[in-house]
């Protein structure tokens, strides 16, 4: 049996999936940056227009999950949108954290639409010098 594929229909389907608002079962990814500042990793997520109360941050084992939801502005009953280009819905991002990070000391700040997480490196993973001692017996190696 010969199947025909309409590339325009397929393109429309992909466009709808990419531009559709996120849902809790299928959230949209949020942009992020990550860098290291000394002994701390800094991860920033763009979440403009999101109420800080609508942001959830969970760490389970080594999986960090950030979820946020942005709804329509104002009271939806009395608002008639003329232009709606800003994405609405649920946004989510998951990161696998290394065992060398201290997940008990994660700090989160939300300012000017940017969520910033600071994740310190665990003390046990920081660089340290090991002093070399001299043994009790001194033997000369001959060969």
Curated annotation (Swiss-Prot):
Residues in the signal sequence: none
Domain called sHSP: residue spans: 23-135
Record's keyword terms, sorted: Stress response
Highest taxon above the source species: Bacteria
Claim: Ubl conjugation is one of the keywords in the record: no
Induction pattern: By heat shock.
Gene3D superfamilies: 2.60.40.790
Similarity-based family: Belongs to the small heat shock protein (HSP20) family.
Name listed for the protein in its UniProt record: 18 kDa heat shock protein
């Amino acid at each position: 049996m010969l199947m025909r594929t309409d590339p325009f229909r397929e393109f429309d389907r992909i466009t709808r999936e990419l531009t559709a608002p996120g849902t809790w079962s299928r959230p949209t990814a949020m942009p992020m940056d990550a860098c290291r500042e000394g002994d701390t990793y800094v991860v920033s997520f763009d979440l403009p227009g999101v109420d800080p109360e609508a942001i959830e941050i969970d760490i389970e084992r080594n999986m960090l999950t950030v979820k946020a939801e942005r709804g329509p502005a104002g009271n939806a009953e009395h608002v008639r949108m003329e232009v709606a280009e800003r994405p609405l819905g649920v946004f989510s991002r998951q990161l696998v954290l290394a065992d060398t990070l201290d997940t008990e000391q994660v700090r989160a700040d939300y300012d000017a639409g940017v969520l910033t997480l600071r994740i310190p490196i665990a003390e046990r993973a920081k660089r340290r010098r090991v002093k070399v001692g001299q043994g009790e017996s001194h033997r000369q190696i001959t060969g």
